[in-house]
């Protein structure tokens, strides 16, 4: 009897401690100082944080090299997004501030701090490039060029619907709309729900916090960036070289590089049919930001010859 009781207790304890974070728990984060293992558990040993064992909140380099402020300075940030406070932009009055970006990034320890300095710079350039495309206010003949107008908009343009899909897990709140907001233009109740749970904010009842609270706005975008969505890897794992394409990925021409990140975000509409102006816009931002950070953009920037992963978080919004 004692043996059976002990076994049952151990199983209950195991179930209670499993699936605390990461893709197994809707992108939920561990407490500060803990890593999320590839199995979705939180801890701070090599089994959780070591190479090949960690899926998110992984340790960066030691000392100053692991500090995001050492990768991108305030002046670089302003140079990249130098028209975000233009009078024509919703983000004027410095909504998308450097301090808000750094503060939000602090909740995701691996973001911009994983790998060597080249990997860290490329991640910041890629993140700001993809989100700049989603929020751009630029046009071909815009002052300083079309790639100087990222982070202009806070909310989806036009007349968006409520983006409410019936769900018992992520029920829509009365009168709330879940259209695109923030740097990554997160949309749909089934994305606001898990994002809010991961960052500790009730976004189902308060979706507009993504467009009114600067730190929450950046957190929503970094959450998307860091969260794998099977069969897709996370954008973070791609740009830092942690993702290794499977046989199916290779057969679909999905190889490591900036192009796969575009495929993750909006491959269903933009990838697999040759040249696409939206893809080229993303690449244009990326090349400019890599130049400012003093790093090469790497290979495989396009996704024109890649088959898409299928629908993603943003496929219906862009």
Curated annotation (Swiss-Prot):
GO cellular component: vacuole
Keyword check for Cytoplasm: no
Propeptide feature ranges: 312-318
Record-linked Pfam families: Chitin_bind_1, Glyco_hydro_19
Principal place of residence: other
A molecular-function term among this protein's GO annotations: chitin binding
Similarity field: Belongs to the glycosyl hydrolase 19 family. Chitinase class I subfamily.
Described function: Defense against chitin-containing fungal pathogens.
Descriptive protein name: Endochitinase 3
């Amino acid at each position: 009897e004692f043996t059976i009781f002990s076994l049952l207790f151990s199983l209950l304890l195991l179930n209670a401690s499993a699936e605390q974070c990461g893709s197994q728990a809707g992108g939920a984060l561990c407490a500060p100082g803990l890593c999320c293992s590839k199995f979705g558990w939180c801890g701070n040993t090599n089994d959780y944080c070591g190479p090949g064992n960690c899926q998110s909140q992984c340790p960066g380099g030691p000392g100053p090299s692991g500090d995001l402020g050492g990768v991108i300075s305030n002046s670089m940030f302003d140079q990249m997004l130098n028209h975000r406070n233009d009078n024509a932009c919703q983000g004027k009055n410095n909504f998308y501030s450097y301090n808000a970006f750094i503060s939000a990034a602090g909740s995701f320890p691996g973001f911009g701090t994983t790998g060597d300095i080249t990997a860290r710079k490329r991640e910041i350039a890629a993140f700001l490039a993809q989100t700049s495309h989603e929020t751009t206010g630029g046009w071909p003949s815009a002052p300083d060029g079309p790639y100087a107008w990222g982070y202009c908009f806070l909310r989806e343009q036009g007349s968006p619907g409520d983006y409410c899909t019936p769900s018992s897990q992520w029920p829509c709140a009365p009168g709330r709309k879940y259209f695109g907001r923030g740097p990554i233009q997160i949309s749909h109740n089934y994305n606001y729900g898990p994002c809010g749970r991961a960052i500790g904010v009730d976004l189902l009842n308060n979706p507009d916090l993504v467009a009114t609270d600067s730190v929450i706005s950046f957190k929503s975008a970094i959450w998307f960036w860091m969260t794998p969505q099977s069969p897709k890897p996370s954008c973070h794992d791609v740009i830092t070289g942690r993702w290794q394409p499977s046989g199916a990925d290779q057969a679909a021409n999905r190889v490591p590089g900036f192009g796969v990140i575009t495929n993750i975000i909006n491959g269903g509409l933009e990838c697999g049919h040759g040249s696409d102006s939206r893809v080229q816009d993303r690449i244009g931002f990326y090349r400019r930001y890599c130049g400012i950070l003093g790093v090469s953009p790497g290979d495989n920037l396009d996704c024109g010859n890649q088959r898409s992963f299928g629908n993603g978080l943003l496929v219906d919004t862009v």
